Amino acid sequence: MGLGQGWGWEASCFACLIRSCCQVVTFTFPFGFQGISQSLENVSGYYADARLEVGSTQLRTAGSCSHSFKRSFLEKKRFTEEATKYFRERVSPVHLQILLTNNEAWKRFVTAAELPRDEADALYEALKKLRTYAAIEDEYVQQKDEQFREWFLKEFPQVKRKIQESIEKLRALANGIEEVHRGCTISNVVSSSTGAASGIMSLAGLVLAPFTAGTSLALTAAGVGLGAASAVTGITTSIVEHSYTSSAEAEASRLTATSIDRLKVFKEVMRDITPNLLSLLNNYYEATQTIGSEIRAIRQARARARLPVTTWRISAGSGGQAERTIAGTTRAVSRGARILSATTSGIFLALDVVNLVYESKHLHEGAKSASAEELRRQAQELEENLMELTQIYQRLNPCHTH
C-alpha cells in the first residue's frame, strides 16, 4: 500500500476523532508526498495527547480526550435507551408510525426535543426496531385505551367538582385568616396605644409624687389599672388569632390532602393502566409537541444528574414571619410583665412604643398573613393540576367543542 492510500485513510480517521474532542488539527510536513513510498515507519505526526503512526496504520488516543470521548458515547447510549423506553411505555404505535414515516412530524419532534443531529439519528434507528414490537401489541393497547377513556369520562367530572369546592374553601379560609389577622392587628395597635398611655400616666405619677405630697400616686394607680387592661386585651387578641389560624390551617391541610389523593388516582391510572394516552388525542401536531417536550425533559434530567447541586430553600415570607414572631414575643413580655410590677414603667413605655410603631407599619402595609399566603399558594397549585386533567378530559370527550 502506497503512502497516499495509507495516509489518506489514517488522516481521515484522525480528523474525525480530533473533532469529537473539540479540537481541529492541521499537520504540516517539511516534505512532499511524491518521493516517499517505501519507508513509512518514521513518518509520524504529534499533537497534544493524540498520536498518529502511519507505519503501523494504528490510530491511538490517550489522556482526557479518550476518556471524554468514551463518556460522551456512553451518555448518548443511555439517553437513547431511556428515550426508547419512554416511547415503548407512553407513545401509541399510531404516533410512532407517524413520526417514523412523516418527515415534517419528525422535524417538529426533533425541534421540540432540542436533539442534536447525532442523538436524533441514533434515536430514529432505535425507534425503527421498536416499531415492529409496537405493532404486535397495538390491538391490545387500543382496548386498554378505550377502557381508560370510558373510566376517565365517567369519573373525572365528579372529582373535578369536589376539587373545585376544596379550592374555593381554601381561598375562603385564607381570606378568613387574613381578616382575623387584620382585626387583631388593629386591636394590637389600640392595645399598644393604651399601654403607652398607661405608662405615661404611671411614670408621671411617680415623678410628681414628691411635689404633690403623694396625691399623684392616684395617677400612677390609674395607669397601672389601664396597663393591666391593655395587657389582658393584647393577650386575649393573641389567643384568638392563634386559635383561629390553627383551626383554619388544620382544615386546609385536610382539604389539600384529600384533593391531592384524588388527583393522584388519575395520574397513577394514566401511567399504569393505559400508558398510551397520547393515542387518544385528536390533535397530532400537539401530541408531537408533547412527546418532544417529554424527551427534552428526559435529556435535561440526565444532564442535571451529572452535576452535584445543593439547593437551599428558604420559604417566601419567612423573614417577615420571623420578624413578627420576635415582635409578638416582645409584646407578650411587655404586657405580661406589666401586670406584675409598675416600678419599671419607663421600660414598658419604651416597649409599648416599639410595639405601636411596628403594628402601625404592619397595618399600613396591608396586614398580610403568612398563613393566608400559604393557603392561597396551595389552592393555586391544585388549580393548575386540575387544569391539566381538564384539558385531557376535553380531548378525550368526542362531544366537547372547543
UniProtKB/Swiss-Prot annotation:
Keywords of this entry: Cytoplasm, Lipid transport, Transport
Expression sites by tissue: Widely expressed; the highest levels are in prostate, lung and placenta; also detected in kidney, bone marrow, spleen, thymus, spinal cord, adrenal gland, salivary gland, trachea and mammary gland; levels are low in brain, heart, fetal liver, pancreas and testis.
Keyword Protein biosynthesis belongs to the record: no
Main location: cytoplasm
Subcellular location(s) of the protein: Cytoplasm
Induction annotation: In vitro, is responsive to TNF.
GO cellular component, one term: membrane
GO BP terms in the entry: inflammatory response; lipoprotein metabolic process; positive regulation of canonical NF-kappaB signal transduction
Keyword Transport: yes
InterPro entries to which the protein is assigned, alphabetical: ApoL (IPR008405)
Molecular function terms from GO: lipid binding; lipid transporter activity
Highest taxon of source: Eukaryota
Signal peptide start and end residues: none
Family stated for the protein in its record: Belongs to the apolipoprotein L family.
Role summary: May affect the movement of lipids in the cytoplasm or allow the binding of lipids to organelles.
Protein name (database record): Apolipoprotein L3
GN (gene name): APOL3
